[in-house]
């Protein structure tokens, strides 16, 4: 009889564990459904709030004119949004996702989900022999190894020039005799405020790299012309590498042209 009671008790315990797992699975499904609904609501608000047939504003025909940048175009006032509120929707190790309520130019309200990022630096490291330093690393978001120029995120308040020197040493083991600013790009301004400051490093000397504990990197030195060819035929997809390679190539051609004229 005691053995039968033990068996029954074991069955009851297993049944209880099964029920608990079922409850947990149901809760996860409910959480996923809620999160999906939130995302759908966010996307709906982000794209449009209302019937497109009722739209009373149109872009109009393109205008041939000189390039106008910054806040110098008076027409910009007709497309600007006014932030009404901003709350942190999610906090991560590297960036946050904030949810903004905004007023559209026509007075309607919409929701914008924005990734708040501290920014980053990227370095076009050019050797005296005309080779570019590239790092090969696995990018989890893409699920594959990518080929990029060295780069890294800024810490809040960090000087980008100092960060560029630090990242170059950490990822490649190189120090630079000169680091010059090239440009700043917005990595994906449709939903993220990250700015990447791109520098060119020359006068390189090799030391010892010290990547972060979770960074596994291989470093290559390739001909600048070969990198530019890979950019132009679409084999390089990384935005900062595309911009950095083309800028470096343009500068090199201009310098060579100036030297030939002299």
Regions found by a protein language model. Name each.
Residues 92, 141, 188-191:
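Short glycine/serine/proline-enriched coil/turn segments at secondary-structure junctions
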Residues 2-8, 20, 25, 29-34, ...:
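Nudix hydrolase/Nudix homology domain
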Residues 110, 119-122, 127, 153-239, ...:
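Unchanged
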Residues 99, 113-114, 137, 186, ...:
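Short clusters of small/polar residues that mark proteolytic maturation junctions
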Residues 81-122, 128:
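Acidic, metal-coordinating catalytic segment for phosphate/diphosphate chemistry
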Residues 4, 46-56, 62-69, 73, ...:
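Conserved Nudix-box catalytic region and its N-terminal flanking loop in Nudix hydrolases
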């Amino acid at each position: 009889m005691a053995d039968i009671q033990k068996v029954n008790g074991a069955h009851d315990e297993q049944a209880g564990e099964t029920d608990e797992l079922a409850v947990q699975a149901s809760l996860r499904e409910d959480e996923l459904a809620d999160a999906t609904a939130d995302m759908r609501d966010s996307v709906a608000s982000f794209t449009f709030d209302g019937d497109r047939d009722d739209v009373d504003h149109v872009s109009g025909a393109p205008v041939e004119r000189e390039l106008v940048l910054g806040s110098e175009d008076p027409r910009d006032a007709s497309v600007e949004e006014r932030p009404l509120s901003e709350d942190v929707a999610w906090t991560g190790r590297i960036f946050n996702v904030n949810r903004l309520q905004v007023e559209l130019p026509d007075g309607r309200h919409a929701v914008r989900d924005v990734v708040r990022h501290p920014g980053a630096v990227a370095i076009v490291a050019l050797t005296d022999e005309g080779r570019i330093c590239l790092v090969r690393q696995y990018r989890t978001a893409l699920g594959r190894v990518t080929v990029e120029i060295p780069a890294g995120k800024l810490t809040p308040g960090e000087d980008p020039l100092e960060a560029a020197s630090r990242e170059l040493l950490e990822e490649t083991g190189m120090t630079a005799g000169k680091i010059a600013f090239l440009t700043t790009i917005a990595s994906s301004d449709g939903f993220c405020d990250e700015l990447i400051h791109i520098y060119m490093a020359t006068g390189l000397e090799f030391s010892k790299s010290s990547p972060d504990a979770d960074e596994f990197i291989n470093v290559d030195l390739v001909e600048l012309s070969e990198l530019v060819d890979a950019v132009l035929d679409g084999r390089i997809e990384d935005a900062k590498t595309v911009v950095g390679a083309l800028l470096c190539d343009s500068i090199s051609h201009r310098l060579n042209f100036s030297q030939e004229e002299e």
